[in-house]
Amino acid sequence: KADLERNSALIAERTGKSPRVLAWPYGRHNALTREIAAGLDMKVMLTLEDGINASDRPLDAIRRKIVRLQPDVGELAWQLTWLVAPPHPESMRVMHVDLDYIYDPDPGVQERNLGKLLDRVKAMGINTVFLQAYADPDGDGVADAVYFPNRHLPMRADLFGRAAWQLSSRTGVRVYAWMPLLAFKLPPSHPAAEDVVVSRRGMPTGAYRRLTPFSEKARSTISDIYQDLGRHAAFSGVLFHDDATLDEFEDDSPAAREAYRKAGLPGTAEAMDADASARSAWQEFKTRSLTAFSREMIDVLKRHQPDLKTARNIYARVVLEPAAQERFAQSLDDMLANYDWVALMAMPYLDGSADYAQFIERLVAAVDARPGALAKTVFELQAVDWRSRRPIDDMLTVRAMRL
């Protein structure tokens, strides 16, 4: 704020006019900097986001295009035409990157690993990286630590921000922060450490140990983690991990029971399980609750990453069998309406299917049955058969990509 005040006063002194328009350096801005600029009467702000400026575009987020390499008139006309009417919908060719494989306690080794990653990304010709921002060295799907400074979890290394910047600046890809929504392993002494998802009495718990989305302490903690992520790195989007689910026996924690009662539902999972009508309402309530909480985290991130895109993992079984919503608290229609992208886990052998190609064909047909859904769905293909730990035949993968 002091810099903007000083610069504004200097311009007014030298020109007799106070500045009213601010072009953000490298297009970088967030809600706080916009508020500061607006408070100094610079209410028109220029970003580096491509696109047209329609009448509903806010003045504090005016799009502009950088003209590079001195294009001729024809090339410039094509670029501008593409902005107004792209020849084909935006596509996503994505690679998942697990920072646990880049991290090393030896800084030299870690730097070499990062360099190899950049080379690999360039060679693959992709346009998007889902970059894991949390540490899961034991592979149980729960964040034991994270790769950015934060208030609640151990920081294994301050690696995410650097890797995201290197990937975006040196390879040109869009980087999405790949994050759990609920699966955080807080230190034992943390006030919210035991506010976890609980299964109905006598039933096994789900695949992941998760903080319950119905506890205010847990929600506040997760919100802080997302706020710290947004403050300490620059990235294009967020991918919510496949932990954002509640099965047919969850959640029966005290906080969840209280939330059910407030929503007019029976107060326990067992009571709802015994009533078909209540059970259906319970399923919908859980699905809506997970989506609503993820939307809150999106709003938290957008305070620092205003042009953030969003994606969320969905299990294939939910797409193939709508009744499976009960087992996952997920819905394809709900996700299509609430995120820029749906990241569909198209992994036949994970789902127990013996026919790889047929499974993918069924998935594509199920998504295509919804108008416009294919354009918003990215199919995450299984490249390794985890049962045998052997790579899947390249021709099967190529065939799936061509569908």
Give the predicted meaning of each segment:
Residues 1, 120, 199-350:
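Polysaccharide-binding and catalytic clefts of secreted carbohydrate-active enzymes
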Residues 1-93:
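C-terminal active-site subregion of NodB/CE4 polysaccharide deacetylases
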Residues 7, 22, 37, 121, ...:
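Conserved, mostly hydrophobic/aromatic
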Residues 20, 66-67, 93-108, 144-157, ...:
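The substrate-binding groove and active-site-proximal loops of carbohydrate-active enzymes
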Residues 88-100, 277, 308-319, 365-399:
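Active-site clefts of carbohydrate-active enzymes
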Residues 88-111, 164-165, 174-233, 268-276:
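Active-site-adjacent "subsite" loops/lids of carbohydrate-active enzymes
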Residues 112-139, 232-237, 335-343, 403:
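Catalytic domains of carbohydrate-active enzymes, especially glycoside hydrolases
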Residues 115-118, 122, 135-183, 278-305:
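Aromatic-lined substrate-binding rim segments of carbohydrate-active enzymes
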